[in-house]
């Protein structure tokens, strides 16, 4: 395992693959967590680590592995984002949604710049998924209150994500439930999204 909050981690992962002579033609960026405490109560160091894991490490790993993909005539990149990237920024801890929105745009940029070289990037935007994410982030109790029809198994999400990535799709929103939700989020006025975000935020995370 590797701690992606450490600046050198992406380079060490790449060097390990080189040492083992691995030919990486499918890169999956799927590291993340949430911060329970309010923005003003979180240390700058914690915020920097958060940005590094969810954002900077994705950019660095993609940048490190793309040259070999070009050399080998193509490759696939999966960037695990979130439906939070389409929601009001305040719906989940202040940095989470905006970072995921940035990841979507970054994935689009990879497609624009490298699709003609046989490299495609897929931004995967799942909703609530049964993993260790919420327990590790300290919000499992809140997760348990989410309606069952909005919670899906990791296996189902992974299958749709892998299929979309191998097919070279630019965006994957797993399950019809979240496809409909994202459609609504894209078409609702920003004023309505802000109201939704304000309503969702209290009680989901530490607001002290």
Predicted segments with their positions:
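Conserved NAD(P)H cofactor-binding loop of Rossmann-fold oxidoreductase domains
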Residues: 30-35
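C-terminal helical subdomain
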Residues: 123, 144-181
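Active-site helix of classical SDR
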Residues: 62, 99
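Residue(s) in the substrate-gating loop at a strand-loop-helix junction
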Residues: 82
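Substrate-binding pocket helix/loop in short-chain dehydrogenase/reductase
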Residues: 38-40, 46-51
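The beta1-alpha1 cofactor-binding region of Rossmann-like NAD(H)/NADP(H)-dependent oxidoreductases
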Residues: 1-12, 44
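Active-site-adjacent segment of SDR/Rossmann-fold oxidoreductases
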Residues: 87, 109-120
